[in-house]
Amino acid sequence: SRACRWIGSTLADADSPPCVRLGAGGDRDAAERLGEQALAAGRIGAVLVAGGQGSRLGCEGPKGLYRVGPISDASLFELLFGGLLAVRRRYGRDVPLAIMTSAATDAGTRAFLAAHDYCGLDPRLVLVFQQAELPALDAASGDLLLDGPGRLATAPDGHGGLLVALRTCGGLEWFAGHGVEHVATFQVDNPLA
């Protein structure tokens, strides 16, 4: 099989593709102008990947609820949504936002949005959808894990399932219905996005 060809290989055996420098030369300025034109025309949408729980951070519920603002005590959600509000102020257009949650974070995310009046975002321009779940495997043995007697344990399918989940929930049509031609994707635990 194809995978067996690589058994015993080392990194030194690998072919390295040529390095491609992004944003080199005058291309960056032109790209920024095109991006600003697309924002001003309302052709940009955003997808927030927010399926993770905040347990490693000591936060109950969705990771987006974790408070990181040193002075404002703002949550990750509030900081990220603030960036979209800044785009609205600068370009005069809202950015439609799709938020991918998981079974573990969906209800908490929806409750947060409702309790905080969508942090100033237009609720009609926010789509919340869930990523799929896959059977959980033991990392060492590869065996299926059980969540209880006769019940398979599952886990979110991760970032790789984003496009399928977006298509399955009707998100691609939703974006198109709002005039979106380009989508920027960012993660909930990146407050600088």
List where the protein language model places each region.
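Conserved adenylation A10 loop of the ANL superfamily
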Residues: G51-R56
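Domain-scale recognition of functional cores that engage charged ligands
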Residues: V20-G45, C59-A193
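Low-complexity, highly charged intrinsically disordered N-terminal segments
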Residues: S1-R28
